[in-house]
Amino acid sequence: GEALAKKLNLAFYDKNIIEQVAQETKLSEKYIAERGEYALSHNRFSYGFIGRTMQGNSVDDLIYQAQKNIICDLAEKGNCVIVGRCADYILRNRSDVLNVFIHGNKAEKAQRIMNLYGKTEQEALVLMKDTDKKRAVNYAYCTDQKWGVSKNYALCMNSSILGYETCIEI
């Protein structure tokens, strides 16, 4: 995402949305980072026990609503690249949005994590599995759709077949 934004000279938003969500919700950036995209309390067992706002919403709902507002505002400001945070779903009704999902095989994804974050192969595989699972749970909760399913995107690319640079070029 970031490489594409640089290539096209567009604004790029990913984890920097966390700061904006923290400002809007008055929650700490650390808390938002831990909960925001993954919303761990969205399982049926714990959902009844988590904190609620005065309006009856969970804290995770509050975070999602703030992310939604921010993503919509960013899209209104102009062309940009937004990674994750259900942005594809949030912006689905806009005619000026291209939703892209890039996936790859486990080995290459693990290698990328190892190179970027200095993890061992085992650590990379565990991190990848955990992150993907959390994203899928959160995406399903927020959208009632399955994360990574091609029908939810205008374009899906396999970086293991096409290569990272080719995905950027496309």
What are these regions (language model features)?
Residues E19-N79:
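ATP-dependent small-molecule kinase phosphotransfer cores
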Residues I32, L40-Y47, T120-E165:
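Small-molecule kinase domains that catalyze NTP-dependent phosphoryl transfer to phosphate-bearing small molecules
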Residues K68, Y164-E169:
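Short, amphipathic alpha-helical "lid/cap" segments that border enzyme active or binding sites
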Residues L74-C80, A87-R94:
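RNA pseudouridine synthases
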